[in-house]
Amino acid sequence: MKKHPASTLLCAASLLVTSAVTFAGTDTAKKEITLAPEEDIVVHPVTSPYYAEDSFVTTDIRPVFVYHNIPGNVLGGGNASVTAVQVRIKITDSLQFVAYKDGWLDISTPSLGNRGWNDIAAGIKWAFYRNDAAHFQAAAGLGYEFASGDRTVLQHDDSLRAWLSANKGFGKLHVGATFNYSWAMGNGTPLLGTSDWLSWHLHTDYQVCKYFSPLIEVNGYHTTRGSAVPFSAADVASISNNGSPTVSGAVGMEIRPFKSLALRAAFEFPLTHDRDIYGNRITVSSVVKF
C-alpha cells in the first residue's frame, strides 16, 4: 500500500522524540564522542521561532526573517513577511529570560495589504532537569504576549503561554520536542478574533561536522476555543480557527562559520490540507552567541 509522504515524515519525527524520552535514563554516552557541551553542538529550532523553544539556557541574539506564500483560498492569496530579533539572556545555569516575539509584519494580499508592528512577547524558561551523562535536558516556561501590535496586520491580541520542552542527544544526532498552550486573555482587539490553542514542535538535527548540520522539523497547531473563521494563521497572526489542525514539515540546515555564529535556513510546507496560511514558508535566521 502506498504511504503518504507527509504521514511518513510525521511518524518518523514522532518516533525520534518518543525514543529520546524512552531512553533518557539509559547509559547512552559510553561510546559517544563528546565534541563539546551539548548546547554548543545542537541546532536550536529554526521554524516556528515564536513557539519552538528548546531546553538549553544560553545568552544569544537571533535575527529572524520569515517569508510566506499564502494560498489563493486564504485572503485571496499573496505573501507575508516577518522581520524580527529574538533575545535570550542566561540569568543562572537553570533560568533564562526569553524575548521571543517582536518585529515588523508585512502582509500583501488582495483582501489585506498592510504593514505594522508585531505584538511583543517575553517570558522565563526554567531548565529543571539536566543529565549530561545521558545527554538529556528538560525545561518549562511561562510567557506573556502583550497587545502592543497593530490590528491592521492581525495583531493586538494579549495571551498567556506555558510550555514544556525536552531534548536528547545520541552522539551527533539530536532530537527535541516542545509543547505549548496559549490562553487568549481578552484584553486586546484583534481584527479577526482570538482563540486558545495548543501547539507541538518536533526537531532533529545531525552534526555532519563542526561547521554543518542538516535538520528536519514538524510543527502542529490545534485551536481549542475560538470563533469560526475558516483558516488559521498558526504562529503568524491572530486569527481564530474552526478546529481544524495545522501541521507543517520543514527541511533545512545550519552552517557555523565561527563558534559564536550560526547561519540557518529552512523550507516549510503543509502536511495537512485544511485552509490555512501555509502555502509554503522560508525561514532564515542566525544565532549570535555570547
Residues covered by each model-derived region:
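Cleavable N-terminal export/targeting peptides
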Residues: M1-E38
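Transmembrane beta-barrel domains of Gram-negative outer membranes and organellar outer membranes
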Residues: A24-F290
